From Swiss-Prot:
Identification of the protein by name: Cytochrome P450 2K4
Requisite cofactors: heme
Provenance organism: Oncorhynchus mykiss
Reaction catalysis annotation: an organic molecule + reduced [NADPH--hemoprotein reductase] + O2 = an alcohol + oxidized [NADPH--hemoprotein reductase] + H2O + H(+)
Keyword terms, alphabetized: Endoplasmic reticulum, Heme, Iron, Membrane, Metal-binding, Microsome, Monooxygenase, Oxidoreductase
UniProt keyword Metal-binding present: yes
Statement: the UniProt record of this protein carries the keyword Protease: no
Localization (cell): Endoplasmic reticulum membrane; Microsome membrane
């Protein structure tokens, strides 16, 4: 552990201040004065020179601090992460107005130093401009062709479910950690779509990639990486950054090997997945003399990494939250299983059954809402000078759509801080869509895998609840199950074990 990371683990503001002031000397030597801004800017706490508001922010849980600040400063306010000015959008109405109604103004991605380090301006998630537009369009088209269309993805998920059930059955009702088995199953869906085939859960290449993705999610959300994003010159002293870069390099080499194998067996007339389709497009453009297109190796490699990472972490994490919540609230699990038994019986659940399982569907949506796995979304930036709700926001300003404040907006949800499936049910027990349900963000940067994720959550969740009863380990009560999230770029459940007892 480096000196900086050790100090960040302490709760002493004085210690943190002293450390930062000590390390600010190189920054002071290289920084110039900022220009005067125009117009009335969103309000916010007064920043300190260079430090900004970092002494007021909990870098381990910045989303909590930002929610508290919104109570004082309103639905649009300014905070300073070091010298970087950030506009925070809070509450459903404000976030929707920015991301949906003014999508062109707020639709660019803010590329932090850490994001740039592991994407280098390529791929789908952390890019802007024409390259992003083309890669996102191509990804949407091909993911639809190779899995996100109803039948293709449903078949892949139904193929994977027995493998996951088999792993859980091997525990014979004894306590186990859900992380590995759930993430392996979910990762195999995106792997089948991207590469054209699934992996065995014992394949060391596959398990290594999944483990590195999970670790990267934790590292990118760590306090030390937040410090690095504010003060990039701290990089040489941050061990988490070294680990992050090594993981990214290792993942890149593994993807290169997988792509090499697919190239050797490529049939342009029978594409197996996203990679094949990309390679065929690249080859076609090169044969026509277009050597400067966006279809180059870096965009391929980083797009694969983006799809694999996002397709593994968010859905797998949400599914784990769902199982934990069922164990914590057995009366809700009872109602889910009663509905599944009454409507489905012992046959395999299909996507078309969703309309006949309103309570189960409501529980899945409420899990996504309460789990709140992406509380600050992925940062945006303004594409031009904009006046928003009477405030001036300069072009290139970092913007945080505080999704936590949307999913827990007390103007939109009857009991925002409790697990209440009734949020998504009408008086007759039918499923009700809620406009403030923004678990996948919104606008130009809405999750491109939303359709696939919704299908995975429904089919995996119903199949597992049909087959198993989830409960705390012996000696642990429902009240003992901790819903405090593990800190990271996305919010995972804290380490825990569950028992999966067969119902058949």
């Amino acid at each position: 552990m480096s000196l900086i990371e050790g100090l960040l683990q302490t709760s002493s503001t004085v210690t943190l201040l002293g450390t930062v002031l000590f390390l600010l000397v190189p920054y002071l030597r290289s920084s110039g004065s900022s220009s005067e801004e125009q117009g009335k800017e969103p309000p916010g706490p007064r920043p300190l020179p260079l430090l900004g508001n970092m002494l007021q922010l909990d870098l381990k849980k910045p989303y909590c601090t930002l929610c508290e600040l919104s109570k004082k400063y309103g639905s649009i306010f300014t905070v300073h992460f070091g010298s970087k000015k950030v506009v925070v959008l809070a509450g459903y109405k404000t976030v929707k107005q920015a991301l949906v109604n003014q999508a062109e103004d707020f639709g660019e991605r803010d590329i932090t130093p850490a994001f740039y380090d592991f994407n280098q301006g390529h791929g789908i998630l952390f890019t802007n401009g024409d390259s992003w537009k083309e890669m996102r369009r191509f990804a949407l088209t091909n993911l639809r062709d190779f899995g996100m269309g109803k039948k293709g993805s449903e078949e892949k998920i139904l193929e994977e479910i027995p493998y996951l059930i088999e792993v859980l059955e091997k525990h014979e009702g004894k306590a186990f950690d859900t992380t590995q088995s759930v993430h392996h199953a979910v990762s195999n869906i995106i792997s089948a779509i991207v590469y054209g085939s699934r992996f065995e859960y014992t394949d060391p290449l596959f398990t290594g990639m999944v483990d590195r993705v999970n670790e990267n999610v934790h590292l990118i959300g760590s306090a030390s990486i937040q410090m690095y994003n504010m003060f990039p010159w701290l990089g040489p002293w941050i061990n988490n950054l070294t680990r992050l870069k090594k993981n990214v390099a290792d993942l890149k080499m593994e993807v290169i090997e997988l792509v090499r194998g697919l190239k050797e067996t490529l049939n342009p007339h029978m594409c197996r997945g996203f990679v094949d389709s990309f390679l065929v497009r690249k080859q076609t453009l090169e044969e026509s003399g277009k050597m400067d297109s966006f279809y180059h190796d870096d965009n391929l490699l980083f797009s694969i990494g983006n799809l694999f990472g996002a397709g593994t972490d968010t859905t797998g994490t949400t599914l784990r939250w769902g199982l934990l919540l069922m164990a914590k609230y057995p009366h809700i699990q009872d109602q889910v299983q009663e509905e599944i038994s009454r409507v489905i019986g012992s046959r395999q659940t299909l996507v078309e059954d969703r309309k006949n399982l309103p309570y189960t569907d409501a529980v899945i949506h409420e899990t996504q809402r309460l789990a709140n796995i992406s509380p600050m979304a992925v940062p945006h930036t303004t594409s031009r000078d904009v006046t928003f709700q009477g405030y001036f926001i300069k072009k290139g300003t970092s913007v945080i759509p505080l999704l936590m404040s949307v999913l827990q907006d007390d103007n939109e949800w009857e009991s925002p801080n409790t697990f209440n499936p009734s949020h998504f049910l009408d008086e007759q027990g039918g499923f009700v869509k809620r406009d403030a349900f923004m678990a996948f963000s919104a606008g130009r940067r809405v999750c491109l895998g939303e359709g696939l994720a919704r299908m995975e959550l429904f089919l995996f969740f119903t199949s597992l609840l049909q087959r198993f009863r989830f409960s705390p380990p012996p000696g642990v009560t429902e009240d003992d199950l901790d819903l405090t999230p593990l800190l990271g770029f996305t919010l995972h459940p804290s380490p825990h074990q569950l028992c999966a007892v067969s119902r058949v």
